[in-house]
Amino acid sequence: QTEVVLEGSKEEASIKQMAENYDPTYKISYEVVDSAAFEDIQNASYDDNGDAIVNGTKYRRLKGEDALFMEFYKWPDTTTYHYYKYQPIKWRVLSVNGNEAFLLADAPLDFQFYNLTGKDVIWETSTIRSWLNGYDGECNVENKDYSNQNFINCAFSGEEQTAIITKEIENEDYWHNKQNNTADKVFLLSREEVQSDKAVSYGFGNDLDVHDEAHRAQATIYAFAMGACVSNNGTFTSS
């Protein structure tokens, strides 16, 4: 996504300052618009996900108080909405089998907890799985319904969703937790898929002690605003 800011606003000054003073390896993506264009975006009718279509373009709005962490992105205040323009997702093609392609988003698109609370969970019962796929509360330990507010419905059109294959995920046991296989359209890579001979076939290195550029990805500006650290940080796997 690209952040959209009003020309001459404090948000423009803030994001320019971040772009100048933050980690030089991270390119902050923003677009400055005039007052007429910004008013159209600001006054649009946003749904429960915070999304709206304005003149054929999809936008997401977010306030600082709705972010999971505020330590990294420099919010001028916590109650003013910021606006993010959706962009086509850039994919890494990990493998192709016939007419099926295994895809990984090239950049972290959002920032979410693996589970909403500190409960001992596995992939099958985590809230991140429900949020990614739009499952109801019966599928996670928090009983939280994600059938309306989720990732898959926001990131993909109905036509695109029909093209995504539901795959059986062979989940590795984690410590003392026995994992069942799951059937999901969207999922996190497993440990085996990022560190093993299989990972090498996907283009990743197999030695975590050696810097591997393929394991590196820069978060989108929206994920940054939600709380993602854009310097050195790790990510969760499904296992």
Predicted stretch roles:
Residues 1-239:
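Collagenous Gly-X-Y triple-helix signature in extracellular proteins
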